[in-house]
Amino acid sequence: MLYKSPSDWNTSQSKSIMLFGMSGLGKTYISELLRNNGDWFHYSVDYRIGTRYMGEHIADNFKKEAMSNPFLAKLLQTDAIYISANMKFNDLSPLSTYLGKPGDPSKGGIPFKEYMRRQKLHRDAEINSMLDTVHFIQRAKSLYDYDKFVCDTSGSVVEIVNCDDQDDKVMKTLSQYVLPIWIEGTEEHTEELVKRFTKAPKPMYYSENFLIECWNNFLKEKNIPETQVDPNEFIVWGYRKLLENRLPRYRKIAENWGIILKASDVAKVKSADNFTSLISANLKG
């Protein structure tokens, strides 16, 4: 572990952390707080995925849709217009839109085969974006003179890490440069996340085997072909299963390489100093 004791953490001029856990429990809230009032460099993995690795795929998807409109198609073919994704730290909708949801095309769904292809692209992009953390730690220091760095991970980081392998490439590399911190929710948090997701379901990234299992079980349970699947119904149906599947693996990552902070404690944090003190209190040694 990068910081072996509260003393190591408190006395270190350079502090680098990696926040992970389910979306909605405070990763980005804390990252923005540290950036805005604590002189921390904020590295958003989702933003990196969408801009560096998936940007061309996203833009091509927009162009494909535009080409179905004769008016826009002519302008595109003559380079009269330019189409690209306007990705922002606080608005990653172009990335989510590209990932899509499988099911009935008339309800906004895409074929499952195409959905799987996009999922694989996202996996590669997320692995590369996570490993880019090392470069950005060095870049933040050499270019902008930041001694403090927060890696704001995607909720799906657990899907690209083998938590049972101490030599996992992503975690073995990153644990040399950052302190991994799992923000752990309660059953009440899980229920709130499910309720929130049900109201506004969004595309998700799944591990391949888990996704195929969920898809086949859904088709069997509903007794329908994939072209009749309501995309939102499937995404909502699988969300709780996804949470339950991820939670023990989040814990294993924290036990192997980092520490655990309770979401209820993180929610009380109002300043960078509050947060660094909370980390210190949860480091052993």
Task: Go through each PLM region and give its residues.
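A conserved segment at the C-terminal end of the G1
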Residues: 28-41
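Short beta-strand-centered segment that lines the nucleotide-binding/catalytic pocket of NTP-utilizing
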Residues: 39-54
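Conserved phosphate-donor/acceptor-positioning beta-strand/loop module used by diverse small-molecule
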Residues: 152, 170-223
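The conserved Walker
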Residues: 23
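ATP-dependent small-molecule kinase phosphotransfer cores
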Residues: 54, 59-163
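Pre-Walker A adenine-sensing motif
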Residues: 1-11
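NTP-dependent small-molecule kinase module
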Residues: 222-285
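Hydrophobic anchor at the beta1->P-loop junction of P-loop NTPases
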Residues: 19
